[in-house]
């Protein structure tokens, strides 16, 4: 499984949000998409997920053009947006059953049981979504993104606003997903990248200013990631 992004661009009027970025990802990697607020991370993820058209450039997932064949591509893409709207009046298990029908999943009961165990939602499955903590809502959002067992998982700020214990649990969950898929998650929190990522993409003012394994980036600049980030985004 591979993802190839080539010369991807997007503007809003005269404002360039994403400026001809290119990169190549493969299965088994947890890749951090790092950049300050407004760098273009969310716009890029929306285009990769097939929810926003690009102005130019291409996105191919295992040879499938995402925008020219969005229905087929979305079958193997999971996406958790930064502002994830959940049906708060539904029960957790009820919501997952609804999503199973949307994705036409076979063996629904088996898949939901597996997913609840994988995401640590066992004690919450019979509770209303509106009563869940921020951490459990994020778990449910991730469960919703991976219910159809996608090969590309895009997570937009999945650890934002979580307490330290929730952070550890969500990090472990994200890492576990990389066994079966390409994982790309955006963040502006440097500790998240160093904690769980193999590789980092750094976006600044819509341009890709770094794309390499974290170990090589640290070795090249001979300093910590915080100083490297300041250097790349100023």
Label the predicted regions.
Residues 57-68, 72-73:
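Conserved ABC transporter NBD signature motif
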Residues 167-179:
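Helical segment within the ABC ATPase nucleotide-binding domain
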Residues 193-195:
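A short, surface-exposed alpha-helical micro-motif characterized by mixed small hydrophobic
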Residues 211-212:
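ABC ATPase "signature
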């Amino acid at each position: 499984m591979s993802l190839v992004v080539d010369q991807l661009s997007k503007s809003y009027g005269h404002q360039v949000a994403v400026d001809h970025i290119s990169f190549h990802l493969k299965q088994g990697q947890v890749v951090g998409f790092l950049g300050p607020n407004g760098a273009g991370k969310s716009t890029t993820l929306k285009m990769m997920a097939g929810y926003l058209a690009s102005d130019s450039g291409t996105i191919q997932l295992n040879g499938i053009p995402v925008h020219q064949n969005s229905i087929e591509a979305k079958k193997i893409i999971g996406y958790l947006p930064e502002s994830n709207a959940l049906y708060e009046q539904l029960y957790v298990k009820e919501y997952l059953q609804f999503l199973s029908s949307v994705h036409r999943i076979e063996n629904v009961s088996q898949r939901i049981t597996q997913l609840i165990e994988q995401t640590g939602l066992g004690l919450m499955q019979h509770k209303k979504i509106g009563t869940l903590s921020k951490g459990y809502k994020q778990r449910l959002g991730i469960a919703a993104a991976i219910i159809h067992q996608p090969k590309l998982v895009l997570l937009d700020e999945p650890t934002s606003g979580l307490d330290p214990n929730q952070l550890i649990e969500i990090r472990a969950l994200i890492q576990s997903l990389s066994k079966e898929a390409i994982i790309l998650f955006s963040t502006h929190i440097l500790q998240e990248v160093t904690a769980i990522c193999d590789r980092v993409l750094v976006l600044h003012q819509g341009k890709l200013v770094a794309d390499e394994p974290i170990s090589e980036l640290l070795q090249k600049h001979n300093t910590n990631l915080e100083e490297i980030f300041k250097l790349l985004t100023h």
